[in-house]
Amino acid sequence: IIYPGTLWCGNGNIANGTNELGLWKETDACCRTHDMCPDIIEAHGSKHGLTNPADYTRLNCECDEEFRHCLHNSGDAVSAAFVGRTYFTILGTQCFRLDYPIVKCKVKSTILRECKEYEFDTNAPQKYQWFDVLSY
């Protein structure tokens, strides 16, 4: 399913090439960049010692953070907000990154209960781990 007016926002893309964008160009450009994240773990795939249990691809946290920033700065306010809420809030996904081992979640959001702040063991070596993606 691709969001109307875009070619890149949704499951896969329907573009004829990497330079083609839909009607909502700024939102679509954000989705295209997100789709091209170089560090991903496919659905049910493994990488960096992690296995993705989800039915969709998960990305390095840096790519998700860039995606959020891009959507917030998009001139296509309505389509960007819809895509942002769908991906970050409704999907409730996780991203991964290299960091000190998580000891526990220090602060959870009130409604969706995603972890907003983690406590880390800074004496242990860093490793790849899953992190909650915050709501849009």
Swiss-Prot record:
Molecular functions (GO terms): metal ion binding; phospholipase A2 activity
EC number: 3.1.1.4
GO cellular component, one term: extracellular region
Positions contributing to Ca(2+) binding: W8, G10, G12, D35
Subcellular location: Secreted
One BP term from GO: arachidonate secretion
KW Disulfide bond (keyword) present: yes
Catalytic activity as recorded in UniProt: a 1,2-diacyl-sn-glycero-3-phosphocholine + H2O = a 1-acyl-sn-glycero-3-phosphocholine + a fatty acid + H(+)
Cofactor dependence: Ca(2+)
Cofactor: binding comment: Binds 1 Ca(2+) ion.
Gene3D superfamilies cross-referenced by the UniProt entry: Phospholipase A2 domain
Highest taxon of the lineage: Eukaryota
SMART domains to which the protein is assigned, alphabetical: PA2c (SM00085)
Keyword Amino-acid biosynthesis: no
Tissue/organ expression: Expressed by the venom gland.
Residues with attached carbohydrate: N16
Cystine residue pairs: C9-C31, C30-C70, C37-C63, C61-C95, C105-C115
Active site residues per record: H34, D64
Role summary: PLA2 catalyzes the calcium-dependent hydrolysis of the 2-acyl groups in 3-sn-phosphoglycerides.
Family label: Belongs to the phospholipase A2 family.
PANTHER family: RH14732P
Record-given protein name: Phospholipase A2
Organism from which the protein derives: Bombus pensylvanicus
Record lineage: Eukaryota, Metazoa, Ecdysozoa, Arthropoda, Hexapoda
